[in-house]
Every structure is written in structure tokens, then in C-alpha cells.
Swiss-Prot record:
Residues recorded as bearing Phosphoserine in the entry: 87, 199, 209, 225, 229, 239, 243, 281, 285, 402, 406, 414, 427, 431, 445
Organism from which the protein derives: Mus musculus (Mouse)
Domain FHA: 109-161
Region ranges (Required for interaction with FOXO4 and MEF2C): 81-406
Name the UniProt record assigns to this protein: Forkhead box protein K1
PTM comment text: Phosphorylation by GSK3 (GSK3A or GSK3B) promotes interaction with YWHAE/14-3-3-epsilon and retention in the cytoplasm. In response to mTORC1 signaling, phosphorylation by GSK3 is prevented, leading to translocation to the nucleus.
GO-annotated molecular function: 14-3-3 protein binding; DNA binding; DNA-binding transcription factor activity, RNA polymerase II-specific; DNA-binding transcription repressor activity, RNA polymerase II-specific; RNA polymerase II transcription regulatory region sequence-specific DNA binding; sequence-specific DNA binding
Membrane-spanning parts: none
Pfam families, sorted: FHA, Forkhead
Disruption phenotype: Mutants exhibit a growth deficiency and a severe impairment in skeletal muscle regeneration following injury. They show atrophic skeletal muscles and their satellite cell function is impaired. Double knockouts of CDKN1A and FOXK1 don't show significant differences compared to wild-type.
Main localization category: nucleus
Composition skew (Basic and acidic residues), residue ranges: 686-695
Interaction with SIN3A and SIN3B, as annotated region: 2-40
Modification sites for Phosphothreonine: T231, T233, T408, T422
């Protein structure tokens, strides 16, 4: 009993818990409940005690019980009083030893050795290694703190805590051990388990509910759908809307921007809600194994910004990415190299060396503080899909505003179509119908088409020009791809002129037909048309413009003369740049003309063969007039593209015979060059010999020759 009396703390409490229903303990509890009221009567009871001794055998059981209670009262009263003091309030923590368990219900508890100088809340025995006031536990919501008051210190989870050290924040569970002893106390916090679980989830809903946004699906589809084309011919879903078109383009952009911002806010809210729910519930990582729509830099920003101290090691970044995005768990390890490259090359990521005091190895990575807010804001912004970009050509309002047609859309120009379908950017009017029904089918064999307009100041600015752009030229096969017979009928001559255009595969040809008659087929009139008042019996004249190949697709100037016959047609053929070694195109004009009367002789105008040079039209023939107003006009027109022209004048012997004809000879393809001969016969004089310049091989010379006939200048021949 002396042992119980000495240790009136923990052992008495242990006895109470071991037998809570014992009558001895009930009596002790009753005695402790009335300590002040029962203390005066005991001194008055001893005098009548001795007379009552003989009467003890009768009521024997009751006095024995009371005697037992009186002998054990000094040890148990203190424990019962301590339990009564601790009863109010919930338990904050639990302290467990080998033979006791103590519930901490007060904000401050003292642990030490019990002595006569002062009491402690939890006595650990009479060991001299334990101070009278050794430890002090204090609770400051929501953490517990330990302060060491004993001179020997204490071990907390193996870490020594000396006397006078700052208060140590305790974890949820830890173990105290007194030095030089085997006495241990197991500490367990009960505050978090009883009150904390329900609190984090309740304030989550008021924060998320205002961010819920409902966007009607039909309205969104109508906003996102592409604007229909005015002509209804071509629809490009991914093309950018043209700003000059439509009055609602600005409002469309505004609504689209607002819609994208709302969707972005909704995505942020949903992602934040999912992350908070996952953290609060302690659930598993997401199960979506698809590749996340974020760049490596965004993944790095997400990982670093989620850290508590805003810095992570390379392994920490890897762990964060694999935890939140399961795709990278099974993916090839090449993404780790990309993460390292982004960290090293991106100027927004700063490498911070680890201090010597910090354990571990490897440097930390941080985000540049100047750009951290902006990068964190864009960390969860999904990347946009790469669409078809729009290119605007700098050729003014008549140029194309959309991308050219690709080879995968062969239906742009079909052989059965009534007209050529053009993009809406060209013109709102229909394109002209091809003159030849087979032209569409022949142009359809070319993989790609481009549309352009002539310069506004040109004579045919209102006429669209079809430019067929074939693939790269092939030197192996020289197969003609265009053969267009046409008929030119003049008002004076019912017979037709056959025009054959033979074009090789790599050649790009642009043909324009311009007529001067008011009721022509196409209705385009030459702007530089001169006076046509004079009437002469002349045949239809064809002008060929085959310019220098180095000019490519540039527009060739048209040589205009003083007068143009009423039914003349101008045919211009412009050749593109050709690869070396690829044969050029050949244009052959066969023009049978009526003989022109000069005195009593008929001078037939023979066929003109041209290959790559300018052909000069024969003007109206009158007496005492040159076919060309001046030889300098021809030289000036051909100075940039052809060799110098040699002009030979042939004068007639007779005084009354007018000029005959003008002829220009150039390089012909397989046939020898044809020349025009002026024959004038007079009595007793021989004919003038024809000028024939041929090489031994049968090919024409490279230097063209022009011969003109003039009026009578007296007898003799001038050269």
C-alpha cells in the first residue's frame, strides 16, 4: 500500500480503469466527491468508536468494506480527482505507455517526476533521470508543440531535443524517450481525425458553383460554323474569314473570343475542382491514358507551381508528370529528354543550386519571378490544332484571298462543267465559257490551276486569263497536251484560216484573242485601235507575239499601227520559262489570201512560218506608201527580244506599179523558211531574183530578213 501511496498518479488511474465497477473504487469516488464535507466528522467519530467495537461481528461486512476504503483512499482520491478534472471537453491527444494511457483534454499538459514540491499532470515514476518538470505539451490549433524543461533532454523519434530549445512542432504520431532509460511515451494526435475530415469538402461547393457556365449547343454551332460563300462554288471550312467581306465579321470575332474565354474559364474551374477533390479524398491518380494537350514547358510550369516552395528537382518534375498524366508512365522515355532540353534552353526556367546543409543531390528548378504569373496562368491552356493557314497575295482586291486549289480536288475544273468555277475572291460574275468545248477537258489534265487578272490599265483588263501551271518538266516524254483548231473568217473572204497551236508538256501558254469588230464572238476591243475608214481588199491578218522566254509570264506589249483592218484578230502567245534541253512550242499559221492586184501582175502572199519571233502585220497597201511607216518602229519593237532586222527595199522599174508586200522570215521548225517575193514585170526587163538564204543542212538562218516594196523612184534598183 505504501507503493500505491507513493505513486498516486498513474498507478491509481490504472487501477481505476482496470476495475471500474469495484465497490472499493465506488467508495473512493464517493469520498473524493465530498472531500470538504466529510473531513470534520472523522475526528468526532473516534470517541464512540471503542464502545462499538464489540458490535463489529454483527454488521461485519459493512465495516470491513469501509476500512478497506479508508486504507486505499490516499492513493485513489488524487487519481479520481484528476479524472474528474479532465472529464470536461473532447480529447485532443492520446499518450500511451507500457502500463498507462492518458487522454489530453487540456491545452497544456506537464510530464515529469512526482514529488512533494509540486504535482504534474502525468507522472513517470521516481527515476532520477527524469526531472520534476521534464516535458510540456501545448496545443495551438491545429498543431501540438513540445518544450523540453528537463536538464537531460528528450528524444523525439530518435532526434535529440535539448533543454531550452525552441518549441518543436509535433507530427500526428511520434515517440518520446527519456535519456538513459527505456521509458517511452507514444503520442497520437486526435484533433485531425475527429474534426478535420468533414471540413475541407464543405467550402468546396460554394467556390465552384458560381463558376458553372452553360452554353447552348445550337448557338455555339451556329457561331463556329464557317460563313457561306457568296457564290456557293467553294467552301473552305478552315480558311480565315476575309475582313472586308460581310458586315458581321467584327461581331463574329468578338463572340468567338468571348466564347473561347468562357470555355477556358470553365475548363480551369473543372480542373481545379477535380484536383481539389482528388487531394481531399486521397483518391488515385487520373486514369486517362491519352496524351495531354499541353507542351513540355506547360507541364514543367504545372509541376513547379504545384510545389510548396515553388521549386523542384528534375526527378520531382518527372514524378509530378507521371502522377497526373498516366500517358507518360508507359510512353517512351524520350519525353524526359525533352523535359531536360526545355529546362536548359528555356529562359523562363532558372537553375538554383542546392545548399550544403540540405540533404540529397541535384539542383532545383524555379520559374523566373518576372514571368511566373503569366506562365502559371497559361499552364493549363490547351494547344490549338494546326489548321489551314490563309495567304493573301499582294495583288490588290482582284487577287485570290484563299489558298490555291490542291491536287486532291480535281473537281474545280471539270470537262462537263458549263463554265470555269472560280473562288469567291475573283469576281462575283460568272467566268467566261471556253470557246472550245475540249478546252476544259484538256486543262483538267493539268494538276493545279491559278487565276490572275491583267493590269487595270491594259486593253483587256476585263478578260480573265487562264494560266495552266503543269508539274515539273520532264525531258523524257515530249507529248503534246493541247491541240486547238480554230477558224478565223473575215468579211471579205469566206474561206477559213487554220491555226494550229502545238504545245509541249512543260510549256505554259497564255492565248488571248482580241477582235476589233463590234459583233465579235467575245466582244473585246483593242484599246489602241486606229482609224479604219479606208477600205482595201486585204485579207485577215494574224499577229503573233512570241516574246523573249526570259520574261516568263509577264504581259507582252502589242504593236499597234496606224490602221488595222476591220476584221483583223490579234493572237498573242506568251511562253513561260522553260528548262534547258526542253523543246519549245511551235505556232504555225496557214493563211491562204486572195491575190493583190499590182498593175497587171498578181503577187501571191505565201504562208508565213514563225518560231519564237515577232511577226509584223501587213498594213493596208496604198500607192506611194510604205508598209511600215518607218523601219525604226520595227527595230524599236524588237530591240529587247530579237536580233537586228535587215530591211531591203526593192524598187519597181515601171513608173506605175505600186508596192507589193512585206515578209519576215524566221527560224522554222522542220520545214524551210518561206519568203515573200515581189515580182514586177515590165517590157524587156528580167525579173528580180528571189532572195534565198539557206544553210547546207536545209535549215533557215537565224537572222530574219524583211523586204518591203515602195512606189516608183525612177529606173534602177536601190538597196
Amino acid at each position: 500500500m505504501a507503493e500505491v501511496g507513493e505513486d498516486s498518479g498513474a498507478r491509481a488511474l490504472l487501477a481505476l480503469r482496470s476495475a471500474p465497477c469495484s465497490p472499493v473504487l465506488c467508495a473512493a469516488a464517493a469520498a473524493a466527491a465530498f472531500p470538504a464535507t466529510t473531513s470534520p466528522p472523522p475526528p468526532a467519530q473516534p470517541p464512540p468508536g471503542p464502545p462499538a467495537l464489540p458490535a463489529e461481528p454483527g454488521p461485519g461486512p459493512v465495516p470491513s468494506t469501509v476500512a478497506t476504503a479508508t486504507t486505499t483512499a490516499p492513493a485513489l482520491v488524487a487519481a479520481a480527482a484528476a479524472s474528474v478534472r479532465q472529464s470536461p471537453g473532447p480529447a485532443l491527444a492520446r499518450l500511451e505507455g507500457r502500463e498507462f494511457e492518458f487522454l489530453m483534454r487540456q491545452p497544456s499538459v506537464t510530464i515529469g517526476r512526482n514529488s512533494s514540491q509540486g504535482s504534474v499532470d502525468l507522472s513517470m515514476g521516481l527515476s532520477s533521470f527524469i526531472s520534476r518538470r521534464h516535458l510540456q505539451l501545448s496545443f495551438q490549433e491545429p498543431h501540438f508543440y513540445l518544450r523540453c524543461l528537463g536538464k537531460n533532454g528528450v528524444f523525439v523519434d530518435g532526434a535529440f531535443q535539448r533543454r531550452g530549445a525552441p518549441a518543436l512542432q509535433l507530427p500526428q504520431q511520434c515517440t518520446f524517450r527519456f535519456p538513459s532509460t527505456a521509458i517511452k511515451i507514444q503520442f497520437t494526435s486526435l484533433y485531425h481525425k475527429e474534426e478535420a475530415p468533414a471540413s475541407p469538402l464543405r467550402p468546396l461547393y460554394p467556390q465552384i458553383s458560381p463558376l458553372k457556365i452553360h452554353i447552348p449547343e445550337p448557338d455555339l454551332r451556329s457561331l463556329v460554323s464557317p460563313i457561306p460563300s457568296p457564290t456557293g462554288t467553294i467552301s473552305v471550312p478552315n480558311s480565315c474569314p476575309a475582313s472586308p467581306r460581310g458586315a458581321g465579321s467584327s461581331s463574329y470575332r468578338f463572340v468567338q473570343n468571348v466564347t473561347s474565354d468562357l470555355q477556358l474559364a470553365a475548363e480551369f474551374a473543372a480542373k481545379a475542382a477535380s484536383e481539389q477533390q482528388a487531394d481531399a479524398s486521397g483518391g488515385d491518380s487520373p486514369k486517362d491514358e491519352s496524351k495531354p494537350p499541353y507542351s513540355y514547358a506547360q507541364l514543367i510550369v504545372q509541376a513547379i507551381s504545384s510545389a510548396q516552395d515553388r521549386q523542384l528537382t528534375l526527378s520531382g518534375i518527372y514524378a509530378h508528370i507521371t502522377k497526373h498524366y498516366p500517358y507518360y508512365r508507359t510512353a517512351d522515355k524520350g519525353w524526359q529528354n525533352s523535359i531536360r532540353h526545355n529546362l536548359s534552353l528555356n529562359r523562363y526556367f532558372i537553375k538554383v543550386p542546392r545548399s550544403q546543409e540540405e540533404p540529397g543531390k541535384g539542383s532545383f528548378w524555379r520559374i523566373d519571378p518576372a514571368s511566373e504569373a503569366k506562365l502559371v496562368e497559361q499552364a493549363f491552356r490547351k494547344r490549338r490544332q494546326r489548321g489551314v493557314s490563309c495567304f493573301r497575295t499582294p495583288f490588290g482586291p482582284l487577287s485570290s484571298r484563299s489558298a490555291p486549289a490542291s491536287p486532291t480536288h480535281p473537281g474545280l475544273m471539270s470537262p462537263r462543267s458549263s463554265g470555269l468555277q472560280t473562288p469567291e475572291c475573283l469576281s462575283r460574275e460568272g467566268s467566261p465559257i471556253p470557246h472550245d468545248p475540249d478546252l476544259g477537258s484538256k486543262l483538267a489534265s493539268v494538276p493545279e490551276y491559278r487565276y490572275s487578272q491583267s493590269a487595270p490599265g491594259s486593253p483587256v483588263s476585263a478578260q480573265p486569263v487562264i494560266m495552266a501551271v503543269p508539274p515539273r518538266p520532264s525531258n523524257l516524254v515530249a507529248k503534246p497536251v493541247a491541240y486547238m483548231p480554230a477558224s478565223i473568217v473575215t468579211s471579205q473572204q469566206p474561206s477559213g484560216h487554220a491555226i494550229h497551236v502545238v504545245q509541249q508538256a512543260p510549256t505554259v501558254t497564255m492565248v488571248r484573242v482580241v477582235t476589233t469588230s463590234a459583233n465579235s464572238a467575245n466582244g473585246y476591243i483593242l484599246a489602241s485601235q486606229g482609224s479604219t475608214g479606208t477600205s482595201h481588199d486585204t485579207a485577215g491578218t494574224a499577229v503573233l507575239d512570241l516574246g523573249n522566254e526570259a520574261r516568263g509570264l509577264e504581259e507582252k506589249p502589242t504593236i499597234a499601227f496606224a490602221t488595222i483592218p476591220a476584221a483583223s484578230r490579234v493572237i498573242q502567245t506568251v511562253a513561260s520559262q522553260m528548262a534547258p534541253g526542253v523543246p519549245g512550242h511551235t505556232v504555225t499559221i496557214l493563211q491562204p489570201a486572195t491575190p493583190v492586184t499590182i498593175g497587171q501582175h498578181h503577187l501571191p502572199v505565201r504562208a508565213v512560218t514563225q518560231n519564237g519571233k515577232h511577226a509584223v502585220p501587213t498594213n493596208s497597201l496604198t500607192g506611194n506608201a510604205y508598209a511600215l511607216s518607218s523601219p525604226l518602229q520595227l527595230l524599236a519593237a524588237q530591240a529587247s527580244s530579237s536580233t537586228p532586222v535587215v530591211i531591203t527595199r526593192v524598187c519597181e522599174v515601171g513608173p506605175e506599179e505600186p508596192a507589193a508586200a512585206v515578209s519576215v522570215a524566221a527560224n522554222a521548225a522542220p520545214t524551210p523558211a518561206a519568203s515573200t517575193t515581189t515580182s514586177a514585170s515590165s517590157s524587156g526587163e528580167p525579173e528580180v531574183k528571189r532572195s534565198r538564204v539557206e544553210e547546207p543542212g536545209g535549215t533557215a538562218t537565224t537572222q530574219p530578213t524583211a523586204m518591203a516594196a515602195t512606189g516608183p523612184q525612177g529606173p534602177g534598183t536601190g538597196e
